[in-house]
């Protein structure tokens, strides 16, 4: 199993650079119809009207400028969770963000977009109990989302038309469910996948990530938003009969591998930004930081997010005793759960990796123990290791079951 780092470009033109030209004769470039990267004025103005009405809500959904929050939630799988957590960490360094705003990783592990349906309470309960509740938040406080997701069951070769239509329908069902479980959700930014040319052909998700699948994914996002703008009743975002939140592009992420795109010079480097055994979709810490900075810069400057993401006079009453991301200064110790620690691949052929999803302020001790209780590997790390991605090598050790033990402060976790 390894990344296909030799496939560092495809020759495909990023949707942001394609302009008024067409892909496959049918799919015009640009993030929006007409081959442009800016939303239609009418749609943008409606979005401005929506965000002007955003107010901090308490856990019961009441407007409260003292303790309430405007929650920005990141939705998707682990490809969203890691970078979004890195963005939350970066936000600590800024003093000019809205103290009434709280960003929360609401991604749900390895589930695909087909799990995001009304009635699949297990999926939504997990987010409520392990993502929101641990931050003293409730679903009713979620008002803005960032979504990057795809289907794991719909294969895609070189054919784009059917794949785009299928994925748009998947998005529509998911967004309808998001509106159901988050009744105050007003606005969702949607991003297409980044470059997928480094995908590992031995991985189960290869068909989802490989090119041109990731490239096609961006046209699906464009078509989704186009249909809402064009008045598709299943994507209605206003009452009466609201079905989904207002949709607009989040940061566009697809660039042709190492080829800088004209739009902003973005590239994706296999060797430094993609995890060795991450399938071509899990990023290294460097890659997560890169995507986190893209997200943070986007929210700081976007026309629709600047008014509620950045600080201003209307948010002054939320400021005392809070960090820029809305968390309280000197909070109680973060509750770390088993879900915040990812060990992969499992099973392993000798080399495995550990990824911590939460900020870790306590010392970390990691041990690997064999079946008779012998410690075969032991490492210790200081308290300043947030969002760290570690590699461990058991090559040369006898095959069998090993137990991974991690001690964060005085709290132990074990996984075989």
Model-derived segments and their meaning:
Residues 49-60, 118-137, 166-176:
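A Trp-anchored, charged/polar loop motif used as the substrate-binding/catalytic surface
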